């Protein structure tokens, strides 16, 4: 019998090719910091709600912080056989504090866990992108001012069409990036709801406090529908950039 978490009915080991295909750790290791933040908020909520003892909560939180330090110090070993970031962290936590680590998964699924991780990841990245956009706009605006009367060819259909100034051309990017900035800042409102507590898809019978865990993680409120909470990934589209700047990089080669 396989020792995989989901392989109770399997009698043989999984094919190596399927192992490679199924493992997401090569991508979701980036979620490690957020995964630990989510776990700490969740276990604190369980203690507040009386689902676990305060002493158990403290032990698990201390263990999670040790795992986080190992990751930050570059000493943590990400294992493909454990598939994803959640199981990698939980496995290491079990090694550090013992079987009590299993209580971390009470009233929670990897489904609501990863959905919450992704939102925290996006919120941080979007805030960083907005700062970069503003810096870029300042640089472009200054360059536009310095080159307000520099003549350059304007293109339509990848062909030279009309004379324009370099300043005018650079300011078009300032406007483009401004729309990106508005779109990104607006998306933060839609990301400001926590999926945590939705469990696999239908919630949990444990007396949890989703409002509390949401506030611990900095969210305004929990998501209203548990199915939507674990299944929606439209939030990933919020960071899609405008393709214009990439498209225009081809223009100089068409002259």
Which residue stretches match the model-derived regions?
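Hydrophobic alpha-helical segments, chiefly the membrane-spanning helices
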Residues: 249-255
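Acidic/His metal-coordination segments adjacent to aromatic residues that form catalytic metal sites
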Residues: 233-236
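Residue-level micro-sites within transmembrane alpha helices that shape
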Residues: 111, 246-247
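Conserved small/polar residues in nucleotide/adenosyl-binding loops
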Residues: 238-245
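Intrinsic disorder/low-complexity segments enriched in polar/small residues
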Residues: 69, 248-249
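A structural signal for small-residue-enriched, beta-sheet-centric alpha/beta enzyme cores
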Residues: 223-228
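A helix-coil-helix interface module used to build multimeric assemblies
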Residues: 1-203, 207-215, 221
